[in-house]
Swiss-Prot record:
The name this protein goes by in its record: Argininosuccinate synthase
Predominant location: cytoplasm
Protein family membership: Belongs to the argininosuccinate synthase family. Type 2 subfamily.
Transmembrane portions of the chain: none
Pathway terms, separated by semicolons: Amino-acid biosynthesis; L-arginine biosynthesis; L-arginine from L-ornithine and carbamoyl phosphate: step 2/3
Catalysed reaction, written as an equation: L-citrulline + L-aspartate + ATP = 2-(N(omega)-L-arginino)succinate + AMP + diphosphate + H(+)
InterPro entries documented for this protein: Arg_succ_synth_type2_subfam, Arginosuc_syn_C, Arginosuc_syn_N, Arginosuc_synth, Arginosuc_synth_CS, Arginosuc_synth_type_1_subfam, AS_cat/multimer_dom_body, AS_multimer_C_tail
Subcellular location(s) per record: Cytoplasm
Length: 445
């Protein structure tokens, strides 16, 4: 049996994730006119482009909401962002520049906290502004049903009646004006933006064309570092971690992680740090393109990964990165709270993050251009004296030790040479290869 309603649930409470924008304003008022009883829930995610959160619930009431609530999600969102950082839950990157899954993290928090608030008000029908082509419709569906198994979904954008009457921005604006609201449609940008305290996503419209570069975007969390008229000064910043948690920036200790993230955003934003241009695979396997900002997470991630490479061994780092990519995909798919994701996340937090204590000093320049100036930690296993080219007292190993180690390598070298001779006899090492390979012969018995 489907949980999705395809027409307005008349005389029933309908919770709507209300942003105060044109889409949700028109949808809320239209639902009220059609006989639904809308309840509006607004998530305070620390969006950098939102100036007055308290005005949003009042706006919802004016459009016909029976009840309008503002839910502060910032603390939970930052906590989930730090958990993603600790576990390296980022699977999308281009040439080493990372997308920090900031929108999927926002959806995980919004989807769970708003539905929890709806349950308090005995609201078991939920709607939001996600379209059928995107990722969010599935993310919200999963998180909503995880929080409330009795939840039913009503999305105006899946209702033919709504689409036929108010299928575009022009129609929605005219509808509100005819209903007596002094609504002025904002100038439409060349792309759409979605943001929270962790980062911003710019996509769609002109950005769907790969010939439109990052230069058409006006950053909301940082500076347009690619412009010659934008001055960006070098800046040195020190980031301190304690058992995997960021606790200090430039010597200032933060007990409130929200305040720490805001300051990290300000520091990274002054340089345009963390901006990236990514082509990605949506949940439905169609490709999309986005321009992303995440100045604070990018700053923290540089320091965190520097400490990881200085503290952990190769096998641990490999496991952390492989598990992180897998976890990043689960997060992207709306499975952040699924058992397989919790298993990967908690393993990284316990066995990787717990050892990460120390300070990293970084020089920031333009965009993602930076240098690491110093790394300090009592947990470092980096010990230059072990490999020093100078003569040292009590060397950890001698030339004779290395001779013995190399002699042991003869075992697998012999096996490898034997296999290559088999492949050579079969003609597998000649022909199509553009590289001249040596001729191999089997060892004579």
């Amino acid at each position: 049996m489907s949980n999705i309603l395809q027409s307005v649930p008349v005389n029933q409470k309908v919770g709507i994730a209300f942003s105060g924008g044109l889409d949700t304003s028109a949808a809320l008022h239209w639902m009220r006119q059609k006989g639904a009883i809308p309840y509006a829930y607004t998530a305070n995610l620390g969006q950098p482009d939102e100036t007055d959160y308290n005005a949003i619930p009042e706006k919802a009431k004016a459009y016909g909401a029976e009840l309008a609530r503002l839910i502060d999600c910032r603390e939970q969102l930052v906590a989930e962002g730090i958990a993603a950082l600790q576990s390296g839950a980022f699977h999308i990157s281009t040439a080493g520049v990372t997308y920090f899954n900031t929108t999927p993290l926002g959806r995980a928090v919004t989807g769970t906290m708003l539905v929890a608030a709806m349950k308090e008000d005995n609201v078991d029908i939920w709607g939001d502004g996600s379209t059928f082509k995107g990722n969010d419709i599935e993310r919200f569906y999963r998180y909503g049903l995880l929080m409330n198994p009795a939840l039913r979904i009503y999305k105006p954008w899946l209702d033919d009646a709504f689409i036929n009457e108010l299928g575009g921005r022009k129609e929605m604006s005219e509808f509100l004006i005819k209903s007596g609201f002094d609504y002025k449609m904002s100038t439409e940008k060349a792309y759409s933006t979605d943001s929270n305290i962790l980062g911003a996503t710019h996509e769609a419209k002109d950005l769907e064309e790969l010939s439109s570069g990052m230069q058409i975007v006006e950053p909301i969390m940082g500076v347009a570092f690619w412009r010659d008229d934008v001055e960006v000064k070098r800046e040195t910043v020190t980031v301190r971690f304690e058992e995997g948690r960021p606790i200090a920036l430039n010597g200032v200790v933060y007990t409130d992680l929200v305040e720490l993230m805001l300051e990290a955003n300000r520091i990274g934003g002054r340089h345009g740090l963390g901006m990236s241009d990514q082509i990605e695979n949506r949940i439905i396997e169609a490709k999309s393109r986005g321009i992303y900002e995440a100045p604070g997470l990018a700053l923290l991630f540089i320091a965190y990964e520097r400490l990881i490479t200085g503290i952990h061994n190769e096998d641990t780092i490999e496991q952390y990165r492989e598990s992180g990519r897998r976890l990043g995909r689960l997060l992207y798919q709306g499975r952040w709270f699924d058992p397989q994701a919790i298993m990967l996340r908690e393993a990284a937090q316990r066995w990787v993050a717990r050892a990460i204590t120390g300070e990293v000093t970084i020089e920031l320049r333009r965009g993602n251009d930076y240098s690491i100036l110093n790394t300090v930690s009592a947990n470092l296993t980096y010990a230059p004296e072990r490999l020093s080219m100078e003569k040292v007292e009590d060397a950890p190993f001698s030339p004779a030790d290395r001779i013995g180690q190399l002699t042991m390598r003869n075992l697998d070298i012999t096996d490898t040479r034997h296999k290559l001779a088999i492949y050579s006899s079969a003609g597998l090492l000649t022909g199509n290869s553009s590289v001249a390979l040596p001729s191999f012969e089997k060892d004579k018995k």
